[in-house]
Each structure stands twice: as structure tokens, then as C-alpha cells.
């Protein structure tokens, strides 16, 4: 099974507002950068999109070390998601899970892979996390002044 490192980040100008996501995939000496964005979104949605896009870009089952600076993504995928699925995508307080369609997409995107989730402190000088942040900001740029509704660039 191919081993991949994935670094993901999301960004938002206003929350909600225009946002972007970025991801870096690294295996052996190869690097692939991905980015995209939306006109009206939240930071949490962009963090989820970065992880979904990174995993969805893999063309075969892989062992993935996925690095995120999002506590929301880390806690959701490592703990909350199993309870949400058992509860019909409701929280412990019986409220609908926010961003349920993205959590469902992330759950689906991870299925073919063995994913090891890692949290890194954002904006702390981690080079790949900093680059993922740059990609997220680039992905957001077309929407900051009223551009399209969404964009994905590989």
C-alpha cells in the first residue's frame, strides 16, 4: 500500500464569507498541490473540503498521514462522527449536525484508505501547513470580490 502524507488547510475572509481550501499530497519524491474555494462559506467547511479533496484525489487505496490544524476536523473524525452516524446525523443534544453533508463526504472519502489523523498547530512555522494555508488563500482569492460560486484547481 502506497504511503502518502497529506497536509490540509482552510481559510475564510469573514465567517461566513468567501473561503478557500488547500492540500498538499506527498509520496516518495512527488508532490501534488490542490486548491479551491467558494463564494459564501465558513472556515470549518473549508477545512473539511481540504481533507475531502486530498483523500478524493488518491487514485488507489493508500496509507495516509493527514495533517490538519483544525481541532474541529480532528475531533469530528476521531470521535464525534461515529456517534453522529448512530444517531442519524444528530448531535448528542438531538440537533442536526452542522455540515453533515461534508462529514458524510469525508467519511466516504476515507473508506478506501488507512488514514492516520494528525493535528498540527496552525501558523507555527510548520512548512507544509504554511504552504497549505497559502494554497487555501489562493483558492479564496477569486471570490473575495464577488466572483464565481465555487472553484477547484488541481
From Swiss-Prot:
GO molecular function, a single term: nucleic acid binding
Disulfide bonds: none
InterPro entries per the UniProt record, alphabetical: RNase_H (IPR050092), RNaseH-like_sf (IPR012337), RNaseH_domain (IPR002156), RNaseH_sf (IPR036397), RNaseHI (IPR022892)
Catalytic reaction annotation: Endonucleolytic cleavage to 5'-phosphomonoester
Cited Pfam families: RNase_H
Keyword Acyltransferase appears in the UniProt entry: no
EC number(s) given by UniProt: 3.1.26.4
Alphabetic keyword roster: Cytoplasm, Endonuclease, Hydrolase, Magnesium, Metal-binding, Nuclease
Location (main, coarse): cytoplasm
Domain RNase H type-1 residue range list: 1-141
Cofactor(s) this protein cannot do without: Mg(2+)
Cellular localization per UniProt: Cytoplasm
SUPFAM superfamilies to which the protein is assigned, alphabetical: Ribonuclease H-like (SSF53098)
Cofactor note: Binds 1 Mg(2+) ion per subunit. May bind a second metal ion at a regulatory site, or after substrate binding.
Domain of life: Bacteria
CDD domains found in the cross-reference section: RNase_HI_prokaryote_like
Chain sites annotated for binding Mg(2+) 1: 9, 47, 69
PROSITE patterns the UniProt entry points to: RNASE_H_1
Residues that hold Mg(2+) 2 according to the record: 9, 133
HAMAP family linked: RNase_H
Self-association state and partner proteins as the record states: Monomer.
Family: Belongs to the RNase H family.
Functional summary from the UniProt entry: Endonuclease that specifically degrades the RNA of RNA-DNA hybrids.
Protein name: Ribonuclease H
Organism from which the protein derives: Brucella anthropi (strain ATCC 49188 / DSM 6882 / CCUG 24695 / JCM 21032 / LMG 3331 / NBRC 15819 / NCTC 12168 / Alc 37)
Amino acid at each position: 500500500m502506497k504511503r502518502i502524507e497529506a497536509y490540509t488547510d482552510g481559510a475564510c475572509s469573514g465567517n461566513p464569507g468567501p473561503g478557500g481550501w488547500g492540500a498538499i499530497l506527498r509520496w516518495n519524491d512527488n508532490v501534488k498541490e490542490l486548491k479551491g474555494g467558494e463564494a459564501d462559506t465558513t472556515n470549518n467547511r473549508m477545512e473539511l473540503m481540504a481533507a475531502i479533496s486530498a483523500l478524493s484525489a488518491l487514485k488507489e487505496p493508500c496509507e495516509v498521514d493527514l495533517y490538519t490544524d483544525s481541532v474541529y476536523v480532528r475531533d469530528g473524525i476521531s470521535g464525534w462522527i461515529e456517534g453522529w452516524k448512530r444517531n442519524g446525523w444528530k448531535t448528542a443534544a438531538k440537533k442536526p449536525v452542522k455540515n453533515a453533508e461534508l462529514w458524510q463526504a469525508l467519511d466516504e472519502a476515507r473508506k478506501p484508505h488507512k488514514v492516520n489523523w494528525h493535528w498540527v498547530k496552525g501558523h507555527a512555522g510548520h512548512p507544509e501547513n504554511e504552504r497549505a494555508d497559502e494554497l487555501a488563500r489562493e483558492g479564496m482569492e477569486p471570490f473575495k470580490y464577488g466572483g464565481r460560486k465555487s472553484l477547484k484547481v488541481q
